[in-house]
Amino acid sequence: MEKKKVVVAFSGGLDTSFTVMYLAKEKGYEVYAACANTGGFSTEQLKDNEKHAYELGAKEYVTLDVTKEYYDKSLRYMIFGNVLRNGTYPISVSSERIFQAMAIARYAKAIGADAIAHGSTGAGNDQVRFDMTFLVMAPGIEIITLTRDMALTRQFEVDYLNEHGFKADFKKLKYSYNVGLWGTSICGGEILDSTQGLPEEAYLKQITKNGSEVIEIEFEKGEIAAVNGKKFADKVAAIQEIESIAAPYGIGRDMHVGDTIIGIKGRVGFEAAAPMLIIAAHKFLEKFTLSKWQQYWKDQVSNWYGMFLHESQYLEPVMRDIEAMLESSQRNVTGKVTMELRPWSFSTVGVDSPCDLVKTKFGEYGEMQKGWTSEDAKGFIKVTSTPLRVYYTAHKDEGEQLEKEL
């Protein structure tokens, strides 16, 4: 009889390490450990993952690199939309989960797996993101979640691994981190107390730069084309370059409070230097290059795009429609943005764009008009005031009351 073939979405953390060993030893399954990398793992970490997977009893280990797919199919649209959840959080690691899950589902189908296992608990968002993706993309394949379904404690998992000869250090730290291409989330410690913020030592990237520094980010049709004059065909590398320049200033640190998919409130700290800088630069450039109504409608659909990403609705067909609108909106978002960086903050300096709508033959704001006469201006103002004049003529009592209040 053939052994049951199970793919474990393997991060190298405690829950997925326990899952690999338990399924191999206790269940006798044929375990395939698959690490879906969306840009958060270093080469050294991936090597450690492979070594540990085999020590835990996996038959095979594979790294599925979906960093480019993550950028091409979602991250670029998040930049187009200047997506910040609740106006604060760049949907860092959570936006990567869907692409990790899709990669795992494809791999499971490719090897003919009977089941997919992941290490999510029953208290967070990731269980929804993984399970929903597997149900849609790998129908008929069983989903196994030992940590959730067996209500396992961290100590139980550590003890089990130690008893079976796996001695990695899973000591509970004060903080837990999820590191990704689009930022790092921080949980635990002071975050559990709504009255407190995070101390300096909680951040992985410490402040090592003083003074100020100018950075130039060049966009072409909404995508990063160059950083400080250096051209980038690889957009992921451009993001990493900006991160290396801005993170030592402590830029992009904040606290996000929001609603989880399962309905409870959640609080998370984060550090996201490159995302916050890129979004600010991109949004600044759009103010010069988009029409008023392009900006307005793009803001509306961008909020929906970010919410759907967070809520595990990336596969919803309307997302492709929103992406089409976002991409269309970027056809004139080309130019160079200059910003000044300093410890804990940054500011926009200026824009140089061939599509600059501020510098036109019609005039400059607050200066001399060139595209109309003074009589044109007076006529425009009179016509614009018509709805208000009509209303208060019909409702004189409200007009009189308004005069008294003002």
List the model feature ranges, each with a label:
Residues 2-406:
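Nucleotide-activated chemistry modules centered on ATP-dependent adenylation/adenylyltransferase
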